[in-house]
Amino acid sequence: MKIALLLSGQPRRYRNGYKELKKWFLDRYDIDVYLHAWEAKEFHKFNFFNRGKLEKIHRVDEDLYDNLVNWYRPKDYLFEKSIQFDKKDIKGKNNQRLNSQMGMWMSLKRVWDLIDNSGIKYDLIFKTRYDLLFTHRVANTCPLLEDLTQLDPEYLHYFGYADNWPHTAYQMNDQIAIGGYDVMKVYCNLFPQMLNTIFVDPSYSDNYEDVFINETLIFHHLKTNNIPMSPIDSGFNGIRGLDCGCSIMR
């Protein structure tokens, strides 16, 4: 089975993030890695749950980008100067910023273009981030950690929310996504049409209270494109948090 791992976004907490991916995936499977990362001297982490205030500034190591290449040994990669998409600080009621949204989805589009240009049609494609913690957040018996190759490539797999999460009907966890080429092509190509979806498409803007939430945006995108989805049970039944899966290392 040909497997590709896509990493994109801001490479915060990349050292521990690499250890996690190495432990659970890179050491266990034959995986081709593709990287896209934004280049900057520092990355800002905002807290959506505290009125969008700045929570932490991550200083960039001088050897960060060299380390990414040396450690992951990617099939292909692109490091690109950070782009300011929005100077007006547009954000929704839940404090997610349009600028951050566009950076996230454009980075994913960039790394998808790398894999597409390779000409290799992978059986399974795994999209993730640089800063995720799986250990003690996801059970060893979870299908993702037990045997990645058993996931059906016809479906888009993602961590399911806890049963008591009130927005399950129209949101999905966006930390990871796994599927075959066809479903992942749709997932990774949200960026070219996201502004039209947010600001023009009435089927989106008229149906959701906050149009600037990534979890709502990607769920709507997949539903609109008739992509079959299959939530992954983390194995802890929600007792480790509503996201029911890996956590972002702050």
Predicted segment positions?
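A short, conserved acidic/glycine-rich loop-to-beta-strand motif
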Residues: 148-171
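Active-site-proximal specificity loops/subdomain of glycosyltransferases
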Residues: 36-119
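Short, acidic, metal-binding catalytic loop of nucleotide-sugar glycosyltransferases
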Residues: 19-31
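Local beta-strand N-terminus motif with an aromatic residue
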Residues: 2-3, 30-31, 121-123
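Short beta-strand-to-loop acidic/aromatic patch adjacent to the donor-nucleotide binding site
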Residues: 121-133
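Catalytic core and acceptor-binding pocket of nucleotide-sugar-dependent glycosyltransferases
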Residues: 97-114, 119, 133-139, 165-250
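N-proximal low-complexity "stem/linker" segments adjacent to membrane-targeting elements
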Residues: 1-19
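Acidic donor-binding/catalytic loop of UDP-sugar-dependent glycosyltransferases
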Residues: 14-15, 130-145
